[in-house]
């Protein structure tokens, strides 16, 4: 139950259970932490595994359940194997890339990361998708995708951890994986391209509805397959790039060219397949998949409401567009032209042989390569050989490249390894081959020969600044070879900046000298004033770090002679040179400890000291050396509060543990954080019995120490099944009834564990088998509810109480039923048959729990024993309902045969037949219809009477309605086509209502139902009201009457208008709607739009259908559209109507103009607007000479400074409960910011008076308009209270109202306070006397408007949330 699981399998189980310590960290996060390992350089797998697993386990609570499941049982061998594979991979990648491949490598690694991240997430669930696809056409296609993806992942992982030579052999196998993956883009039957294009062409991945599970599963397969396809391309690019680089480093330029060429061909081939060739008839795979995604995204059924599908589609569209853009942006991987070798070779220099590689009788050849920005060509053919005779360092004459590219020059003697010897820049034609020889001379380990050759070449003009391998110069070369004569000469020739010149990895010459142990060179460079503490680029290592890890004592001493040296300098991860010296050995450590300024307990970023590292390294001599300083803190803790003893316990280092325990200052009971685990806890957790036994016997170890959750070492010993440790604990008298915080005893844990034999051991020790946890569970409860059959039977054989109930009123029999432990259930029933029908607090019986969890054998056993087959729990769930919902026809038949009540229903009125219909189980539906002696669908069903209030409806009515509503077309076809039930539930009307176009088409085209139906409301009415444009279009195109009456004397366009479906209105308007026709309310479509506050529709009708409407028309009460807009306080609509010339003087049946109505109702903003008829308030500024301007200065007051809210509205907004006295005390120093903040408070204060109540879940547009107007009017009240006309005249209240309305309507309610604040931005600061009045209005104003809620989220705007 965990012992045989792989690391990945266990990670999957534990992460799915959503346990606090997600085990998947071990397989992924640990690997991701390699850059911060507590050692430097290559680390053996054991140390890496230990350090990383410690960090991850110690960082979270040791949860009992996860530990029992093995989620904290760390398999070191597997982790070491993973780490070793990753180290091999890193080693390969650390090989230097040729310049030609660096950019390609960056592109590939970046793209792989983006694609593989989401592909791995999909991979976890793809097996489930495969298992659930039963469709005969689709299943084989999806299987091909699955098979290929599995093969790809398996092979990729298999080669990942190979050693270098094995890796090369595997990649170069004839007809091997590279060839197979290259063919994945061909139409071959076993390729990946074939099934992907098949899915696209057959439209298998385009769902017909939100419930089209098959199509959505195929869509997941298409996306998964496409991402795999892209991954294959990048994998191939990565491998060919690696092979090319490998052979470049080996000097095999023919092989380099071969793989360099393959690299480009793979890219171009896959690019053609993925993004096409740019012609209209050759679309790439990505374009086709994006088209499918857009079709699904624009489906009508996805517009009905928010769901996760839309989010998923958007993320995939973004991903594939990004990939497409990346691929399209790269025209090719290499320059297409292979350079011709036009070099003319002449020996013009007076440099005689032998010198360097120039020896008489050897043959020398040259080859060139073009370089243009980030693109490189293949390396051209080698020139004809030239025999070396007495002369060296020839001049190469080449024609100037017309395209102004750089030319890299390579040289090869005989069959030796080629070398890059230089670069010819544009416009130059002559190249003297001398600089590489100077570099080689500086690199010569024979210092005398090297110095002689260097002197000669330097005299003849060689460039000491030329760069070669990894950007290194002769300075680096001399530093590495240790040629102090050359370096001495160079120090006089070079500038100080050149002595500090870093290579591509940041290594300066002194880094190289220190890393090579060349103390003399180090000393020379220090004397010349180089930067002693300079750092490498990635790891930020100083020369001292490098000398320390190599153990070079003399080099260390020379470095320490510099007064500038920082002995405690930290690298990228916070490690000091002393940390590195742990790897260098005892002598270098002693040298460090003799230094006065050394910080012997220095901590890395993770809190690790050198002593920690010595223990992790299992190196007691090094640890002893540190201890001799008498300054080591042996109890120092890292970031997880882990001491050196913790690490020894985790890694199982018994001898180290003994040494540590014997130290006088040791504290063996320090606990980790936040897990609170001691060294003893860890030794048991990691199953190091020898270390655990030693610690248990140690007098200074607390054997009863509690970790987080109250877990003691005894609990862990049970969880991990450590029998030897348990025996030792019993012998030393450990209390066997220890309880965790949740009151788990060791026996509880044994009952849940994978070691049931421990139960008898504890029972023999007298353990209390009736002990209860906080939830009231006994050991028997836990054994049954955790599915531990053997444990439960052992407890039952010891005559434990099987009738105990837990906090849910459940007995062990309920647990056995829930987990399907048939043998345990049989044992309990044989002891006590009265528990057969016993109910828990949810009224669930064992039978019902077994049924709800689909344990068929247990269900049949309980029924055979006489259990109530019609048992129902508090929600009405019953066995028959469970199996029908699941689609288990055999069990439905079984329950029918056992005379189950076939009409039994749950609290929602749902019986087995409805569940079968809603879940698309046609086989169960057909079976039920065939059992007429037991089930009759014509029976009246009052369980769902609220859905059929006007009459009593039969099961058939609800069943047909459900089939249509839940888009189960096969069941619809059965009910309507096979059984001929055309009239039940009005299937065409229902299909139109819910927007199921394919069902509408079926009923019209195959069953020949009339598109106008047989009811008052036509299908077109339903589709229009619910905004199903595609259905509306189909019905009209098939002859539906657009002016046919709906209920209430309305037509289809009226229905669409009432729900503000503009697109439907536009379509109907273009297809013969009678705009003069009035409904039962005497309103035309135009008046209906105004009355319903459908602004967009009203604007459309006025702008686009002006010839069909009369803007001044009146209803039965002689009201015009303007009257109606005033009634609803819709200022936005009023502005629209006035703008397009409505007659504002028309009077209604009560002799009132629109202005009269606004005046009577005291709608001041509307009154002001209608009076001007211009829709604009006065904006000209009129200064008030008689009284001081209310808002003039713009100083930042002490009030704002004191409150620290100068630019922070939110902090002030949330201070709703401050009293008016607070405002009075502070108004004397308030300014512009304060004014705006007070407006924020104003809005929140008003809103709490209930502008929008919580009486309903939605509101009409008119309600929204009213709420917006009420807010604006209160805002106006505040401005009026200021007694300053200039303030009011500068604020356009009509504009404010429109913006507030728009914010409410769009759901952006949080913007309302910003709108009102911005309206005051042009106004200066409030004066104290006026602020008093403003505060008074804010505090005393009461809302007089109580309106229904606009939306649930509208509360946010008013401070109710």
From Swiss-Prot:
<feature type="repeat" description="ANK 10">
    <location>
        <begin position="775"/>
        <end position="804"/>
    </location>
</feature>
<feature type="repeat" description="ANK 20">
    <location>
        <begin position="1117"/>
        <end position="1146"/>
    </location>
</feature>
<keyword id="KW-0812">Transmembrane</keyword>
<feature type="repeat" description="ANK 4">
    <location>
        <begin position="573"/>
        <end position="602"/>
    </location>
</feature>
<keyword id="KW-0472">Membrane</keyword>
<keyword id="KW-0165">Cleavage on pair of basic residues</keyword>
<feature type="repeat" description="ANK 9">
    <location>
        <begin position="742"/>
        <end position="771"/>
    </location>
</feature>
<protein>
    <recommendedName>
        <fullName>Alpha-latrotoxin-Lp1a</fullName>
    </recommendedName>
</protein>
<dbReference type="GO" id="GO:0044218">
    <property type="term" value="C:other organism cell membrane"/>
</dbReference>
<keyword id="KW-0268">Exocytosis</keyword>
<dbReference type="GO" id="GO:0006887">
    <property type="term" value="P:exocytosis"/>
</dbReference>
<feature type="repeat" description="ANK 18">
    <location>
        <begin position="1048"/>
        <end position="1077"/>
    </location>
</feature>
<feature type="repeat" description="ANK 12">
    <location>
        <begin position="842"/>
        <end position="871"/>
    </location>
</feature>
<feature type="repeat" description="ANK 17">
    <location>
        <begin position="1015"/>
        <end position="1044"/>
    </location>
</feature>
<keyword id="KW-0528">Neurotoxin</keyword>
<keyword id="KW-1052">Target cell membrane</keyword>
<dbReference type="GO" id="GO:0090729">
    <property type="term" value="F:toxin activity"/>
</dbReference>
<keyword id="KW-0964">Secreted</keyword>
<dbReference type="Pfam" id="PF13857">
    <property type="entry name" value="Ank_5"/>
</dbReference>
<feature type="repeat" description="ANK 6">
    <location>
        <begin position="640"/>
        <end position="670"/>
    </location>
</feature>
<feature type="repeat" description="ANK 11">
    <location>
        <begin position="808"/>
        <end position="838"/>
    </location>
</feature>
<feature type="region of interest" description="Helix H8 is the probable transmembrane region of the tetrameric pore inserted in the target cell membrane">
    <location>
        <begin position="218"/>
        <end position="237"/>
    </location>
</feature>
<dbReference type="InterPro" id="IPR036770">
    <property type="entry name" value="Ankyrin_rpt-contain_sf"/>
</dbReference>
<feature type="repeat" description="ANK 16">
    <location>
        <begin position="984"/>
        <end position="1013"/>
    </location>
</feature>
<feature type="repeat" description="ANK 13">
    <location>
        <begin position="875"/>
        <end position="904"/>
    </location>
</feature>
<feature type="repeat" description="ANK 2">
    <location>
        <begin position="505"/>
        <end position="534"/>
    </location>
</feature>
<feature type="repeat" description="ANK 1">
    <location>
        <begin position="470"/>
        <end position="501"/>
    </location>
</feature>
<keyword id="KW-0677">Repeat</keyword>
<comment type="subunit">
    <text>Homotetramer in membranes.</text>
</comment>
<feature type="repeat" description="ANK 3">
    <location>
        <begin position="539"/>
        <end position="569"/>
    </location>
</feature>
<feature type="repeat" description="ANK 14">
    <location>
        <begin position="908"/>
        <end position="937"/>
    </location>
</feature>
<keyword id="KW-0800">Toxin</keyword>
<feature type="repeat" description="ANK 7">
    <location>
        <begin position="675"/>
        <end position="703"/>
    </location>
</feature>
<dbReference type="GO" id="GO:0016020">
    <property type="term" value="C:membrane"/>
</dbReference>
<feature type="repeat" description="ANK 5">
    <location>
        <begin position="606"/>
        <end position="636"/>
    </location>
</feature>
<dbReference type="InterPro" id="IPR002110">
    <property type="entry name" value="Ankyrin_rpt"/>
</dbReference>
<keyword id="KW-1015">Disulfide bond</keyword>
<comment type="function">
    <text>Presynaptic neurotoxin that causes massive release of neurotransmitters from vertebrate (but not invertebrate) nerve terminals and endocrine cells via a complex mechanism involving activation of receptor(s) and toxin insertion into the plasma membrane with subsequent pore formation. Binds to neurexin-1-alpha (NRXN1) in a calcium dependent manner, adhesion G protein-coupled receptor L1 (ADGRL1, also termed latrophilin-1 and calcium-independent receptor of latrotoxin (CIRL)), and receptor-type tyrosine-protein phosphatase S (PTPRS), also termed PTP sigma.</text>
</comment>
<feature type="disulfide bond">
    <location>
        <begin position="393"/>
        <end position="1046"/>
    </location>
</feature>
<dbReference type="GO" id="GO:0044231">
    <property type="term" value="C:host cell presynaptic membrane"/>
</dbReference>
<comment type="similarity">
    <text>Belongs to the cationic peptide 01 (latrotoxin) family. 03 (alpha-latrotoxin) subfamily.</text>
</comment>
<keyword id="KW-0638">Presynaptic neurotoxin</keyword>
